[in-house]
Regions:
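ATP-binding N-terminal substructure of ATP-dependent carboxylate-amine bond-forming enzymes
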Residues: 1-94
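Solvent-exposed alpha-helices and their adjacent loops that cap or buttress functional pockets
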Residues: 20-21, 36-38, 60, 90, ...
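Internal nucleotide-binding/catalytic subdomain
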Residues: 152, 156-293
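Active-site "cap" helix and flanking loop/linker of ATP-utilizing ligase/carboxylase catalytic domains
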Residues: 246-268, 285-359
Length: 425
């Protein structure tokens, strides 16, 4: 069959890598793709938000199945557009993708259906938000309601910081229309854990847990990024935590969406905080995380197409997700200066060192080909995701960091403490 993957990041490279393992596939397209994806798929110069062009391409090339990796097109309703044309596509419809598209919606949903989360208030007026903050307990969390590339969350330690945050989100519109509504949330302490799942709208099956590293600099300092590295599974996601989440969070979320007439088919990413009072939901995403996909998918034994189809067909209960009993660590190689200002278009060397390896992967995020069609250049803030698989987290971490030395580009930057928490488990 012919498969189209929509997106251009490390997550999409991981998805394409999994799709390429399927014996059912004879042709993969990726729109728009990147220089790494190009070794496995035919990259097509169509942007992820160009729905009409994507549909026309899928029809013209008789694409049998489309997988959408990114949040923007899902929240924008790409699945509805494909389905209206009779095309098979994996991902939630627009009315379900709101679970990530609006933080205010997701908070109200959790409140209504008693899904554990932090106390909060939603605001559409900066004046009301400022008035509320005058008497609020610090630290406090401000969240832009809409999509903000994973950067729309501010943790404020003082009232002054909180006031500045309201100005940034609601008045200066740092995140554009995403800040028209703002969520003010109590600050929760504990360990963060990400859990990826597949659901067909009735059944939900958990893939694996992972832990992200959002901040740009070592020691969790610096600005929020899309993610600087990851490890999976999380040693803090214990059997007890899993049992609690299965009872009060996972199925409850799927059932709540169905009860609201927003049946969810696709991937739900649960961002959890393991607080002293038990696990609580920090956020939902409606797609594979990035770089979570890079640490979870390489361990999946199932044919990804079988699982994705089961989600769409409502037959996920007939399938058992299976994962290798191994650990994975991903270290992101970024352009120095990310997430603010950084140079692009710099040549990358050493990529051939990863050829033929089955336990070390180099997932491309921000890369493109030079005019010569051969040289690979940097093309973004996050450039590569160096991922290693091993029997233990410590071995995987050592292997991943060793492999970061195999590749070079002029402004290569990484955190040196990805997976530090492994030592605290």
């Amino acid at each position: 069959m012919k498969v189209l993957v929509v997106g251009s990041g490390g997550r999409e490279h991981a998805i394409v890598t999994s799709v390429a393992k399927s014996p059912r596939v004879d042709k993969i397209y990726c729109a728009p793709g990147n220089a790494g994806i190009a070794s496995l798929a035919e990259c097509v110069a169509i942007g992820a938000m160009e729905f009409d062009k994507l549909v026309a391409f899928a029809k013209e090339h008789a694409v049998d199945f489309t997988i959408v990796g990114m949040d923007d097109p899902l929240v924008g309703g790409i699945v509805d557009v494909f389905e209206a044309e009779g095309l098979k596509v994996f991902g939630p419809r627009k009315n379900a993708a709101i679970l990530e598209g609006s933080k205010a919606f997701s908070k109200d949903l959790m409140k209504k259906y008693h899904i554990p989360t932090a106390a909060y208030e939603n605001f559409t007026s900066a004046e009301d938000a400022l008035h509320y903050l005058e008497t609020a307990k610090m630290p406090i969390v401000l969240k832009a309601d809409g999509l903000a590339l994973g950067k729309g969350v501010l943790i404020c330690n003082t009232l002054e910081e909180a006031k500045a945050g309201v100005k940034e989100i609601m008045e200066d519109k740092k995140f554009g229309s995403a800040g028209n509504t703002m969520v003010v949330e109590e600050f929760m302490t504990g360990r963060e854990v990400s859990v990826l799942s597949f659901t067909d709208g009735k059944t939900i099956q958990i893939m694996s847990s992972a832990q992200d590293h959002k901040r740009a600099k070592d020691g969790d300092q610096g600005l929020n990024t899309g993610g600087m590295g990851n490890f999976s599974p999380s040693p803090f996601y214990t059997k007890e935590v899993d049992a609690f989440c299965k009872k009060y969070i996972y199925q409850a979320t799927v059932d709540a969406m169905s009860a609201e007439g927003r049946t969810f088919q696709g991937v739900i990413f649960f961002g959890l905080m393991l607080t002293p009072d038990g696990p609580k939901v920090l956020e939902y995403n409606v797609r594979f995380g990035d770089p979570e996909a890079q640490v979870v998918l390489p361990r999946m034994k199932n044919d990804i197409l079988d699982v994705c189809e089961a989600c769409i067909d409502g037959t996920l209960d007939q399938l058992k997700l299976e994962f290798e009993d191994k650990a994975t660590v991903c270290v992101v190689l970024a352009s120095d200066g990310y997430p603010l200002k950084y140079d692009k278009g710099l040549p990358i060397s050493g990529l051939e060192a990863f050829d033929g390896k089955d336990d070390v992967f180099c997932f491309h995020a921000g890369t493109r080909f030079a005019e010569d069609g051969k040289t690979i250049l940097t093309n973004g803030g996050r450039v590569l995701g160096i991922t290693a698989k091993a029997p233990t987290l410590k071995e995987a971490r050592a292997k991943a960091y060793a492999a970061t030395e195999w590749v070079n580009f002029a402004n290569k930057y990484m955190r040196h403490d990805i997976g530090k928490a492994i030592d605290e488990a």
